[in-house]
Amino acid sequence: MGPLNYKLDRSVEIQATPDTVFRFFTDSARWAKWWGAGSSIEAHVGGKVLIRNPGGIEVLGEVLEVVPAERIVFTYGFATGKPIPPGSSRVTISLEPCEAGTRLHLVHEFPEAAVRDDHVQGWRYQLSVFANIVSDEVFAGAASVVDGWFEAWAITDDRARNAAFAKIAMTDVRFRDRFSLLDGLADLSAHAGASQRFMPGVRLRRKGELRHCQGVVLADWIASAADGRDLMSGTNIFALGPEARIVSATGFANLPAAK
């Protein structure tokens, strides 16, 4: 490998722990999810790296370094030899914990500035795909978390309701809607309990499928009276943390238009 004087540098935050993120660099099935069918990686020093892009374009590489949950380094080049042959550039992926989950730092070193510049958009796109693929796995159970949120609002026993919210939400969870300005589990649970005292028997339920992108979930809902009549509908936006618990929720009710 010759001199690599030109660097492409990019950092992104992923809604997952470093251990989870690193699996997508060590498991070929996960590797192929964000690179494409047929792609594979052998996550040990000297292991082979294969990326199969659309149109049959193949990238080949060799793993140079592996530090579990922290760092992986591999060579990168095109099987055809153009624009760069195998072994002629180097990719370093570093992971570190952050508030969102994991900060991924990519450094791709090239022998020529023009080749580096040609890869800027490719990595911008590929890391965007990566963030979504990882979060799809992390938040695969988001529907049960959201359903648990709606169900907790109907629990009249204080201790049971506290436990239900604690199971699905962070201690410092925030909730905002037209009738709520709440911070923390205790505030949230007390507010939900009060809603049952003033509107006994009212229940919330999810309507339809969730929509999800990188830890942000949209859920439509319906509020029903004790006799089963539908009273109101709306949409909640949930922000989930790297452990798939609710960090914040914002509710939008479909209120009648003012006359």
Q: What are the residue ranges of the model-derived segments?
A:
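Residue-level recognition of conserved beta-strand positions in structured domain cores
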Residues: N53, Y76, L106-H108, D177, ...
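Hydrophobic pocket/interface hotspot
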Residues: V21, W31, V49, V63, ...
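A solvent-exposed, acidic/Ser-Thr-rich amphipathic alpha-helical stretch
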Residues: P18, A37-R52, V59-G61, V67, ...
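Short, highly charged C-terminal tails/helix-capping segments
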Residues: N132-G141
